Every structure is written in C-alpha cells, then in structure tokens.
Amino acid sequence: MEEANAKQTAHDEFKRTLREYWGYPDFRGIQRDIIESIAQGRDTLGLMPTGGGKSITFQVPALVMPGVCVVITPLIALMKDQVDHLRQKGIQAAAIYSGMSRREIITTLENCVFGGVKLLYVSPERLFSDIFKTKFKHMDVSFVTVDEAHCISQWGYDFRPSYLAIAEIRKLKPDAAILALTATATPKVIDDIQERLDFRQKNVYRMSFERSNLAYIVRDTMDKHTELIHILNAVAGSAIVYVRSRKHASDIASYISSANISATYYHAGLEPAVKNQRQNSWQQNEVRVMVATNAFGMGIDKPDVRLVVHIDCPDSIEAYFQEAGRAGRDGKKAYAVLLWNNSDRKKLNKRVAENFPEKDYVKEVYEDLAYYYQIGVASGAGYSFVFEIDKFCRTFKHFPVQTHSALQILERAGYIHYEMDPEARARVMFKLGRNDLYRLDEGSAFEEAVITALLRNYGGLFSNYVYIDESLLAQEAELTTHQVYVILKNLAQRNIINFIPQRKMPFITYLRDRVDGDRVVLSKEIYEDRKAQYVARINAMQAYASNNDVCRSRQLLIYFGEERHKDCQQCDVCLEHTSPEPSNEQATTARNAILNLLKDGERHHISELHKLNLPKKGLDIALEYLIHEEEIHLDGSFLFL
C-alpha cells in the first residue's frame, strides 16, 4: 500500500512539473511509462517515432529527481536550442561540446558539481576528456540520457564510435540508470543498444511506428520539378521539401517561388541569424515551403506540416522515415511524397563508392592531414585544428566528396573527431557580480545600451556562458551588429565580461597520437561490415520505392520489425489497387488526347499531359502503350511523334 501511494505521489509530481513548465495537462503515449521506469532506477530504452515527445521523457524527471541529468547527444545545434528553451522556462541547463574553450568547459562542469545545473547536455566526443571524467565523478547524477541511441550500434544507420565511450563513463557512476532514446531502430539495433550500454536488464518501451494520419506516396516521374509544383498546388498548407545538396536547396526554392508559391531554403552553411530568420518565417506561416537539406528538422516544433516531399532519395529507410514523419504531427491528414525514377537507382549505387573510398586512399588522407598540420608520429592527441576541406584538397589534389568520406571512416576508427558544421555562436559571461556592475565607472552610452540589452534578454549571465544573438542586441541597442561586436570586445578587455566571438569553421580533433599511415587499422567491423550494411540499407530504400504491390505503410512497419495486418488504404499502392481499371473507351480517349496534343509535330513537355484533365491511371496506361508501340517517342522530359 505504501509503495502504491509513493508511486502515485511521484506521478503527481511529474504531472505537476509537466503542467507548470510545459503547459500540458497530461502525458501521452508511453511518456509516463518511460518516466516511471527511469524514476525507479531501471535502465530503459524508449522507441518513439519523430514527434513522439522524446525530450519530455528525460526533462520532466530531471527536474523532479535530485541531482543533474547528463544528456548525451550528437546534435550540437539541437542541444543549444534545447538549452536556450529550458533557460527561457527558468530551468538551469548547460551544454558542453567540441569547440568550447577549456575555461568555458571547466566553469560549466563546476556549476554541475556544485548543484547549479539540472540538465547537462554533452556531445559524445567530450566524454573522452580527462576534465569531463574527473568532474563527472564528483557530480550527483540523477540519470544519464542517451539521445539518438542508435548511434552506438554498429548495425545502426548512423554509427558513431564516440558513443562507445558511454559504457566507459557508466563505470564511474554504476548506480545511475541509463535512459536510451531513438526514433528509428530495427530489432537488431534494439538488442545491440542494450548490450553496448550494459543494461542490467532488458527493458524496452515502444510506441507503434504506425502513422495512421500520414499517407505515404511514391511518384515515379521523369519530371520531378513539374510534379513538385503539381503536388504543392494539390495539397494546401505548410510543407518541407528535402534535397541532398546546398545548391539544390537554393535552386529548388527559386523554382517554387517562380510558380507563385512562397518558399525559402535552409542548410548548414547559412549564418545562424539567417537560419533563425528563415526558420521563424516558416514556423509562423509567413513562408509556406521550406526547401532544406537534412540539416533541417531536428527539434523543430511545428505540428501543422501538411506535406513532406523528397526530391532526392535518402540513403536509408531510417532517414526517410524520420524526415517524412515531420508531417502531420497534429494528428490531421498529411502526406509524405517521394519523387523517384530510374536515375535515382544509379545515384544511390554511386554513393557506395563515394562513401567508402579504398582503404589505401583513407590512409593517404590520414598521412596528408599530419603533413598539413605538421603533426609528428606519437604526438597530437587532444589537439584541434580548423579544417578547410577545399584548401586541403587543393593542396593534396584530393576530391572533396571522397575526402569527406575518408575523414568519417577515420572518425569511426577512433583516430580523429571531424566536426563538419559547428554552430559556434557568440557567448558571454559577466566577470563582475550584479552589484559590482552597478558601481562601475560610467562608460559610454553605447556600452550601457549593450549591457542593458544583455541583462534584459538573457538570464544566467553571472554564472554561465550564455549564447547571444548579436543582431538582437544591435536591434535593442539601436546599433549595427559590428558596433555591438566591438563593444563586447572592449567590455572583455576591461574585464567586465568574458566574450567568445562567433566562430563557424569545421575542425578536426586528434583523438589519439598520430601513427604512421601503414599502421592505421581499418577493421572489418569499421570498413567491410559498415559498407555491407550501407549497401543493404540502400537496397532496402530502392525496394521500398519500386515495390508497387505492398502497402507503403506496411513496408515501413515490417522494416522496423512491427507486423501489420491491415493495409493503410491511403498510400499510392492501396489507392492504385482500389481504383477501377480504365475502360476500353477511357483508354481510347486518353490515347487520342495524347496524339491530338502531339499532332502539330512539335516537342511537348510531359507536364502538359496534366492539362488534359484525364484520370491519371488511364493516362499512364495510354502513355506507356503509345511509347511501347512507337506511335510516340520520349526524349528526356519531352514527347513527340
């Protein structure tokens, strides 16, 4: 009886915290089960699809339970966003990641040791450092959260060797429970996660991956651009269009805008202020379509996305499912559309060679790095260097794509950490106390305006390094961004603040001392096995796109080990099976309409067929028949007699 009462009291406290800080009346799905499991000190694995509310499952118990919750995540931009949002709610949160100064790291860790922080976000490569391990021993740790837990599994689609250090730091706090969270995991990965994190007992909570409100569509089309506009005109509401390259993002956004549909684009290469502005415009529905690389979407809270379109085919079903799942989080009808044709098959197969260059090439890149940075044998461990891939490739006559892949392989093998898109925003911490600040000799009016803007917009400035937006300060102080930068530098020189300017450059950190290139070990697990897994994932993605016999939703669920007995009745496969075959009369009408369009002897773009206002199934059959019988001809996207 006492145990039941204690359990109810704990649940009431969790629910009260949820209402107080997040405004939700109750937990949803398996959130409550996961929270109660971790509160009882049990190692727990939570499988929650995109939009399932993962962050609630560790943020709520972190506030209720004594001590600090350490959150391990590879997504630096996401951890910064979450820390900012938590601080805005009055919650003490901090982050440690590659690119921070030693002084910043020590200050942050000491705040955790002395009880000033409830949630500490850490990037996995920081777990290797002696500073972290020393301070971690002295922390009162409530539990450890491992976000994106599939990254610890060699069978996962995004394996990161730095995650293997989690099991090592667990030995420093053997009584602290582990909460592992992922949105995408096959049965094999589920078992591997629990084994590699040394779960004391298997304990899995899973939400069904079924999205009954989301219609999965594959469109086989040679003219993706026209089909995209056709889809955007057919489905109203907010949309995301995913592409693979930064240039493609800007090109497609321009193309959509030219069709009088408001669009912008987003990728990791944009300045933080530009990213924030574009993201806010899209979230507030000032812009309808966001064209983006896979850098966009993590942690984005926008439930009313009605459409997600992939113009370029992702490398894996895991990646596709996660990105497609950003549509329809409000539970209302939404669509996930993959535009596909035979050229995508060739592109996917080409990516194998790009992602897995020959071993000798990987070793050559490792040697060239050492020459580039003048790192001698048996030295270099812990050193970080700014890395300009274009300059490096010009120096040693390498190709950027293969070089990028070689560096990732070296990272998986544990030789380096390669941070490709750091988001090193400017940071400030006051060196003076609040009372000392008010007793300062009078500075310039500009300095006072900047200090006032800092105090008005940011909390925690006297105890933590806080991320700042110099453009926001400029707006508040009625100055230019450059003037704000100069003033912050002056305040730092006067020992009023610690100021770390914005820096956005990829960098490489040596995780161990340099060895000779011929002694670099690329094990079967790191290279051959990973390559085979990559090929298997690409094959699975191709099979999904080209399988027109099995319900799309059922295909996805089977891939993730979830059996489904009913078809969704809303994907393109299900609708094709239920739509009636065109009659002979309809087929003849469609053939005549196509021939009539082409009778002028000109080359006509295939998109003009949409203007015939004929049923798609009948039109497709008629087109296939006419091309097969050579009554008409297809050259790229153009039809002619």
Per-segment meaning from a language model:
Residues 2-21, 25-29, 33-55, 62-65, ...:
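Helicase motor core with emphasis on the C-terminal RecA-like subdomain
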Residues 1-3, 120, 253, 608, ...:
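Intrinsically disordered, low-complexity N-terminal extensions of nucleic-acid-metabolism proteins
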Residues 358-514, 519-622, 629-634:
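C-terminal accessory/connector segments of nucleic-acid motor ATPases
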Residues 212, 504, 637-638:
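Beta-strand-connecting loop/turn residues
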